[in-house]
Amino acid sequence: MRILTLFICTLFTLTTSAQFSKPRREYVEYLISTDHIDRNYQTGQPAYVKLQAFAGGVPLENVYVHYTHGDEMMPLSTGDSILIQSGEALIPIGTRQEPGFRTCHLRFTVDGKEYKDIVKVGYSTESIRPVIPMPQDFEKFWSKVLKKVRSIPMDVEVTPMPQYDSPSVKVSLVKIVCGENGRSIYGYLAQPKKEGKYPVLFTPPGAGVKKIDPILNYAEMGFISLNIEIHGFLPEQSVEEFKKLNEQYGSYPRFNIHDPHTYYYKDVYAGCVRAVDYLCSLPQFDGKNVCVTGGSQGGALTIVTAALHPRVTCLAPFYPALSDMNGFLHGRAGGWPKFFRDEKTISEMEGASIEEAVHTLSYYDVVNFAKLIKVPGFYSFGYNDETCSATSIMSVINSVSAPKKIVITPTSGHWRFPITNMESILWMKEQWK
């Protein structure tokens, strides 16, 4: 009897699991588009967001979609709702009289589950210009900084890390002295095991005080690559140890913001230049090709490094941070870390006045480095980025006079599609001499 019961239970389980297998797609699906396929408009043109929504493949009917819209990263000025009929709703989101972006937030509910999304559209984006000034002594300032840091021996320490090796790539932990009082950076050097001469690739990190891991895929594609951390903390520490460090140092973008000569990013920018100096000193370097790539803060440091180091031959920044950082003081979206956005961010300036902070940031803003770029670049971002505003990113791209390939994926936010990432790598390889 017990065996028969077990057999029946097993049969029931197999039958029901076949009947109720996991769905291969969502019951409610929706697609967002705009009446201009590239989401670009001229100033003064009205824009419309089109929502198409289905439940089990059947167009939704008589469901309200609620929406708000306004200028990018500004208080959303208009809100309303519209009925989805025959699976579609057309949402008017207004226009702009000045170049920039507008944002629409929308949401709707089906069977108690809420669905929400964001869409941004651009207006005369090729005409967006930075608002932060470029100091007259900008280049002189950085020439002095680099002259001083290069007078300090790098005293490089290289430690083989075979536990990270792949069949074709060897990995080493590198420590580079890049400032006074032993100020250092750490990074992971990944080199093809096959003997030969190779292009070098520098990959600065995104924002935060966090653990980094070796990156092997660039070396597997024929680069000698170095990915670094910028704070001088040994990356072999645990995630828990880095969480504690982040609690202490996480607000570093504001450290010493009152003075450009002591601002935290001075050593960071100089450290990136020294990292490229180190890569160019390697005997396996082909002597010709020096590439830089990164995203967010890494995108910013990519542009800074390419502007400051004469041996860089191409760059591929994604959604650069630290760009047009005083935008909010001019009534438009600024770049990460969103200085001056509101009273809270202004109160977090480590005691610096707005005037002092703006003066300091003018020496560190990426748009001013972008004006100095002389080599080809691959620039990519998505309109829906809520970390690094599209307005600030376009102010950077429009400041570059050197040859540039611009790849925009409007639906992406503060991330990129794998295919775009691969496109950037292949593009860099095309620049090899």
Can you say where each PLM-predicted feature lies in the sequence?
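Proline/serine/threonine-rich low-complexity linkers at boundaries of modular beta-sandwich domains
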Residues: 19-30
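Hydrolase active-site cap/lid region
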Residues: 299, 303-350, 408, 416-419
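N-terminal cap/lid segment of alpha/beta-hydrolase-fold proteins
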Residues: 35-39, 149-195
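Short beta-strand/loop motif that positions the catalytic acidic residue
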Residues: 373, 379-381
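C-terminal catalytic histidine-bearing segment of alpha/beta-hydrolase fold enzymes
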Residues: 387-433
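Surface-exposed, short loops/turns at beta-strand junctions within beta-sandwich domains
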Residues: 94-100
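Cap/lid segment of the alpha/beta-hydrolase catalytic domain
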Residues: 210-270, 327-330, 334
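Gly/Ser-rich "nucleophile elbow"/oxyanion-hole loop immediately N-terminal to the catalytic nucleophile
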Residues: 251-295
